[in-house]
Amino acid sequence: MKNDHSVVVANLNGDRNIIRVNIGGAYNIYNAIGCAAALTAFGIDEKTVIDAIEHFNGAFGRMEHFKAGDNTVNLILVKNPAGFSQTMNFLKNIDDDFTLILSLNDNAADGRDISWIWDVDFAGIFEKANVKEIYVTGKRCYDMAVRVKYEGVGNREIKIIENEDYNKLVDIATSQGRDAYIVPTYTSMMAMRPVIAKRLGGKDFWE
């Protein structure tokens, strides 16, 4: 598994196939192989199935990458404890230094009740020294800061980006000399992504 893709071996109809999945994360492997199994069961030929998987790219905000000089700003949407936990597990397996930015909103599309953040398994991510800086933002940034503090972050400071200042977020993400991983809830992602795309280049929504 790499940050931006995985190469897996899948047995389809008894044949061993090496397949590239163009999105990082173990859960995206599960999704791809689940789709392959379903399509194969419906009688779609292996070549068509494999070709479809290898030419698929994620939608905006889902493991999306923006280049910032020699570094990358990564946007990973989360919507519930399961997806958030899988994202933390993915980040735990990154060896290079990075900046982590968590963004929590409580708009209707996010869910008004944010107690679900206490069900997130952070997978011991803050035990790793390569998580160099931690920022939180969004309408409920202080709630996220409390959640992260209770998880335990060692001697790191949890820094707040107030007022949903996404230009400041981009400034921070691009000025650290390392990759940044931004983990927002849905409406936060929808608000910040146009700012990131305008500053760093990227397709408009739905393209």
PLM segments and residue spans:
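Extended acidic/charged loop-beta regions that coordinate divalent cations
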Residues: 1-18
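Short hydrophobic/aromatic-rich motifs at helix boundaries and adjacent loops
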Residues: 6-9, 21-22, 58-60, 116-117
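Generic "edge-of-domain/loop-turn" microfeature
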Residues: 15-17, 26-28, 109, 141
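Generic detection of short hydrophobic beta-strand segments and adjacent strand-loop junctions
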Residues: 17-21, 66
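A conserved, hydrophobic alpha-helical segment in the catalytic core
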Residues: 20-57
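ATP-dependent carboxylate-amine ligase
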Residues: 40-44, 51-60, 65-207
